[in-house]
Amino acid sequence: MATLADSAICFLLLSLLLIGACLVTPTEGRAKDDRRTRGRGSSSGVLSSSSSSSNNMNNGYYSGSSSTAGSSSGYVFTSSSAVNSGSTGYSGPMDSTGFCTRRRDMKLMCYCTPDENHVPVQKAECWVFSEGLHQNDTTWTRFYQQKRLRELKFVIQNNARLDYIPTMIIEPLKNLSSIVIEYSQVEIVKSYAFANLPFLERIILNNNHIMALDQDAFANHIRLRELNLEHNQIFEMDRYAFRNLPLCERLFLNNNNISTLHEGLFADMARLTFLNLAHNQINVLTSEIFRGLGNLNVLKLTRNNLNFIGDTVFAELWSLSELELDDNRIERISERALDGLNTLKTLNLRNNLLKKIDNGLLRGTPALLSINVQANKLETLTFYTFQPIMDNLVNSTSELLVSDNKFICDCRLQWIFELKNRTRHLQLRDSLEDLHCTLQEPKLSHFVDPVPPTILDVLNIGGFTAIGSNSASMGGVGNSVVGSSYSGLTMDDSRKHLGSRSRQALRGQRQFASSAENVVESKMRRRRKRQEEVKEKDLAAVAPAHKRYDYYDDNNGGMSLGHGLDLDDNLSLHKQGFYGAGSPVVGHNDVDVLMTSHSASGDALDILTTKNAIYIKLFLLKPEMLPCHDELSDPTELPLSRDLMDVRSNVGQDMSTAGANSLAQGMTIIVSLVALMMISRG
């Protein structure tokens, strides 16, 4: 009975609980319904208020083409309650002029895309025309309703001024992906100047007056891909100015006044692929500056103040393909400066002060296809310097630009001839053709056949030398006579050509002794009492020409010819005409010389002096006749045989070949052992 009583009590308690639940649930449901009803009413009120405000704003959200009707000033001030319903927090007067309205009296005028009524603006280019556009100017309130704006550009016009970044105006534009400010007077980019813009991908602040970047000036833009600060006056950047920019790919800092780069400045830009630091005042580079830039493809350092590139400066730039170091003051590059640049394809060292390229410099650049060393002070290029990339030069579409240096014509350049013959690409051949060098003590045997007329002029072949008393002599080369006929050539004409045409041929580099002209004239007039005509037929009969080291010998009583060399028939154009025994020789040629250098002593001036040199194209010389000097003691600078050009330049290929041979030998041994074991079992 007790058990039945207990069961009955439990049943009654459960019944009471169920009844209570049924009574409470409708009450709570009604309460929730009441709250939903009040919520809908509240929302309806807000929407009504917003709608009213929107009507009063005269298409503030949409683009417009005219100002508010009935308002001469174009401004309508709304109540602060309407503004407070937004997210700007602004509680002052509003400018209700259509966002894309354009009038001459406006401080700021925007060109919109699309520029249609009742269509949300996606892109706007705004021109500033006023010097008095302050941060609290009501003109800025026109931006508060442009929630869908994605691209915004400010261009400050002449006689206008904007010396701040309108952070308060930009911040509410949450959909903004691109912001551009050009030609402003902004001097400092302050911390978080573009904060709270989650979709921002591009910031361009070029052609402004920016001088400094504060800490966190561009921090925490996790979607930013391009930052352009070119053509400013930046000289100081905080170490953490670019903090937390994980997706940034392109950074432009060129055309500023940057002299120092903090270590780790770009450490938070791991995705950076393009970095332009050209046209600055940078004078020192360290490996820590480029720490973390393993994805960088292009590094431009053109026109800075660099004079030395140290070891492993670019060691962490594993993906670098283009390195621009032109227009600096680089005197030396360390042998290991380019170590680790396995993907480098373009190296520009044009217009520096390099006198030598270390043999091991290109050892770490096996993929290099283009190297420019124009306009330096290089005296030679050795085979061993370019051996690591020789396969590329011969077999790939490669470029080697070497013009405008101070190369010496000697045996160290012999390998250039073989490279020109073996490369498959016309562009490389053409660039090598432009290689000029200085040949000391030129001889006719140095030159290829047929010898160009300009070279003969330089060597005084077919030229003339007028001999005067007191060991005074005058030499002339090339273009010594005007016209093709020698008929009627007088002594006055000869003296005239000696004094003027020769100097023109030598481009002003040759100067006559002060007394030589008068002495020659007097001597020639005394020795010749009458004029003689030289016939064209007489000229044609004189051959071959001679190479002359002309000098005046008082003991012999006249001119002597030394070291005469006969020339080929192909040079018959160079004739000689004689005025008689002991008379000056006059040669005829219509081509100016390239370049010559001379030295003289006393009143005597000879066309070929003890030390003379010419600046000439390398490929006008015979490679086997290039002089070798005793001072070339470095074995890596000695000439190479043709066979050495066949040696593969890529050390890795040599190692792989050796490895393959070793593997083949090992496999042979293993096969032999297996065969012996099978035979023994049999």
Swiss-Prot record:
Quote any Pfam family the record assigns: LRR_8
- GO annotation terms (biological process): axonal fasciculation; homophilic cell adhesion via plasma membrane adhesion molecules; synaptic target attraction
Sequence ranges of the LRR repeats:
149-172, 173-196, 199-220, 223-244, 247-268, 271-292, 295-316, 319-342, 343-364, 367-388, 389-404
Q: How does it sit in the membrane?
A: Lipid-anchor; GPI-anchor
List localization entries.
Answer: Cell membrane
Propeptide feature: residues: 659-682
Tissue expression: Predominantly expressed in abdominal and thoracic segment muscle and motorneuron cells.
InterPro entries hit by this protein: Cys-rich_flank_reg_C, Leu-rich_rpt, Leu-rich_rpt_typical-subtyp, LRR_dom_sf
Q: Where is the lipid attached (GPI-anchor amidated alanine)?
A: A658
Q: Which PROSITE patterns does the annotation name?
A: LRR (PS51450)
Grouped into one coarse class, the protein's main location is membrane
Q: Which UniProt keywords apply?
A: Cell adhesion, Cell membrane, Developmental protein, Glycoprotein, GPI-anchor, Leucine-rich repeat, Lipoprotein, Membrane, Repeat, Signal
Q: Name all LRRCT domain ranges.
A: 405-462
Q: Where is the composition biased (Low complexity)?
A: 40-54
Signal peptide limits: 1-24
Q: Which domain of life is it from?
A: Eukaryota
Any one GO CC term of this protein is: cell surface
SMART domains, A to Z: LRR_TYP (SM00369), LRRCT (SM00082)
Residues annotated as region Disordered? 29-54, 503-536
Physiological role = Cell adhesion protein involved in target recognition during neuromuscular development. Mediates homophilic cellular adhesion.
Q: Report the protein name in the record.
A: Connectin
Q: Which organism is it from?
A: Drosophila melanogaster
Q: What is the lineage of its organism?
A: Eukaryota, Metazoa, Ecdysozoa, Arthropoda, Hexapoda
